[in-house]
């Protein structure tokens, strides 16, 4: 397996290794470009009546409003209305104002509608990777603390050509512009629904985004009475080789019956799972031989084992199977165990 470490002005197109924490120090004026994803006929994710293009704009406007409460920062938007823009134009807008960072805001959806949580996509190479990974960690930390969102981590994805898989990151890289994609949560998963079901919650994501940006750049705000000029941000060393995604599933997933409780009619089953590259993120299990599976649950960090307790129907043959998923949603199935 390959090793991975799992920002209102509308502009015209005419006019891109964990170390010791370092102290954020604001330059004389920071320039941030916030990109509300999608727009126009490009709706984005809309699985349950929510439309991503509208949600990203609400979040972006709130992010801009909050960031402008800080001194020493100029904040721009790629769009402030429902218009369609190409990914290349969005990156070029950021470059035209000499942005220090481009933040592409999104809400997520998975192909099988089973995953949940927030994730950050960073560029895969050099100083842009280091900046994106550091900023991504601060963003996720805010989401965990303020929004109570599960973190899916900071990730990279490289296409078959060896360039960035995601267009906005690819065009930003060509312009030597640091950028991240911020996927705030999943719109197609009930587990995340409570985090995006009101306008104020969408705005809160924007405020969290702004706080993470302020911490990254070491900004201060008189009105908010905060000063992040000495905030310790993650120190990420630029990689000598491009980072790549984890394309392999977890190495191990096994089951073992550890207890049969005939009084309460339950069986305890231990799940053992490992993924040395990106770690185990979710697990699920079936008690009908794989015909149906329970909703995904969060795998406890820093452990290779957990125990589930399932109902037992004595006199009937039952078969349990576990499914475990790593940071890149790679899945491994255990062999069945009868009980």
Regions inferred by a protein language model and the residue ranges of each:
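Glycine- and acidic-residue-enriched helix-capping/strand-helix junction motifs
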Residues: 44-58
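Long, low-complexity serine/threonine/glycine- and acidic-rich segments characteristic of extracellular
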Residues: 248, 256-339
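Active-site-proximal helix/loop segments of hydrolytic enzymes
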Residues: 28-31, 54-251
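Sec-dependent signal peptide cleavage junction
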Residues: 20-28
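Catalytic-core environment of secreted peptidases
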Residues: 29-48, 103
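Bacterial N-terminal signal peptides
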Residues: 8-19
């Amino acid at each position: 397996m390959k090793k991975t470490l799992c920002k209102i002005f509308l502009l015209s197109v005419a006019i891109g290794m964990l170390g010791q924490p370092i102290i954020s120090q604001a330059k004389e004026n920071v320039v941030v470009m916030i990109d509300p994803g999608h727009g126009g006929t490009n709706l984005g994710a809309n699985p349950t009546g929510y439309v991503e293009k509208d949600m990203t704009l609400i979040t972006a406007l709130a992010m801009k409003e909050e960031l402008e409460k800080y001194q020493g920062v100029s904040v721009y938007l790629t769009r402030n209305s429902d218009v369609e823009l190409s990914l290349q134009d969005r990156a070029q807008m950021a470059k035209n104002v000499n942005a220090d960072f481009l933040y592409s805001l999104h809400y997520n959806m998975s192909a099988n509608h089973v995953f949940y949580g927030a994730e950050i996509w960073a560029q895969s190479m050099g100083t842009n990777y280091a900046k994106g990974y550091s900023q991504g960690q601060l963003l996720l930390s805010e989401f965990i603390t303020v929004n109570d969102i599960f973190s899916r981590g900071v990730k990279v994805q490289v296409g078959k050509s060896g360039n960035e898989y995601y267009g906005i990151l690819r065009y930003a890289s060509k312009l030597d512009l640091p950028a991240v994609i911020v996927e705030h949560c999943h719109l197609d998963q009930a587990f995340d629904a409570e985090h995006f079901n009101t306008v104020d919650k969408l705005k809160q994501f924007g405020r969290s985004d702004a706080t993470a940006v302020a911490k990254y750049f070491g900004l201060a705000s008189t009105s908010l009475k905060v000063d992040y000029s000495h905030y310790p941000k993650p120190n990420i060393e630029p990689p000598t080789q491009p980072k790549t995604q984890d394309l392999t599933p977890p190495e191990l997933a096994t089951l073992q019956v550890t207890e049969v409780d005939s009084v309460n009619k339950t069986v305890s089953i231990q799940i053992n799972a490992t993924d040395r590259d990106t770690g185990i993120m979710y697990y699920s299990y079936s008690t009908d031989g794989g015909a149906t599976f329970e909703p995904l649950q969060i795998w406890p960090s820093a452990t290779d084992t957990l125990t589930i307790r399932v109902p037992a129907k004595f006199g009937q043959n039952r078969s349990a199977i576990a499914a475990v998923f790593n940071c890149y949603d790679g899945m491994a199935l255990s062999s069945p165990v009868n009980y």
